């Protein structure tokens, strides 16, 4: 059950980050709206907020980590791919209870559902490089 509720929390965090980037609205307004419309018993609000607010508060650090491993500039990445990468990098660096293989798998699944045809390959490539070269050397 934990994996299902966390998966849904990731999905909601992705949607909230996407809305935040496009609308430039106050991030708390967006999180409140997401919580209000998700009238689902298994919605892990705590994990959603951890991801969503955590990404927003650490976005500069996450960008710094991500940029050297991108095959194109940050502004050339669409909002979905960017949001998926931000969530995954936040989980990799801040959520020690989530194995990195789970983070990669969840990011790829989100990219397959919401991204373009090749988004999941791009996400996998970037995360693989960051994990092997930066986060989990040796």
Swiss-Prot record:
Disulfide bonds: none
MF annotations from Gene Ontology: RNA binding
This protein's UniProt keywords: RNA-binding, Transcription, Transcription antitermination, Transcription regulation
InterPro entries listed in its UniProt record: NusB-like_sf, NusB_fam, NusB_RsmB_TIM44
Gene Ontology, cellular component aspect: cytosol
Any one GO biological process: DNA-templated transcription termination
Similarity remark: Belongs to the NusB family.
Described function: Involved in transcription antitermination. Required for transcription of ribosomal RNA (rRNA) genes. Binds specifically to the boxA antiterminator sequence of the ribosomal RNA (rrn) operons.
Protein name as it appears in the record: Transcription antitermination protein NusB
Lineage: Bacteria, Pseudomonadati, Pseudomonadota, Gammaproteobacteria, Enterobacterales
Gene: nusB
């Amino acid at each position: 059950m934990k994996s299902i509720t966390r998966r849904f929390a990731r999905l909601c965090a992705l949607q909230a980050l996407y809305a935040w980037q496009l609308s430039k609205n106050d991030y708390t307004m967006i999180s409140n709206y997401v919580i209000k419309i998700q009238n689902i018993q298994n919605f892990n609000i705590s994990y959603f907020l951890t991801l969503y607010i955590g990404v927003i508060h650490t976005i500069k650090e996450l960008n710094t980590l991500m940029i050297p491993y991108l095959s194109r500039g940050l502004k050339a990445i669409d909002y979905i791919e960017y949001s998926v990468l931000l969530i995954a990098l936040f989980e990799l660096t801040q959520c020690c209870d989530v194995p990195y293989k789970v983070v990669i798998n969840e990011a790829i699944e989100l990219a397959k559902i919401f991204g373009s045809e090749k988004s999941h390959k791009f996400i996998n490539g970037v995360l693989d490089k960051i994990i092997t070269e930066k986060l989990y050397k040796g």
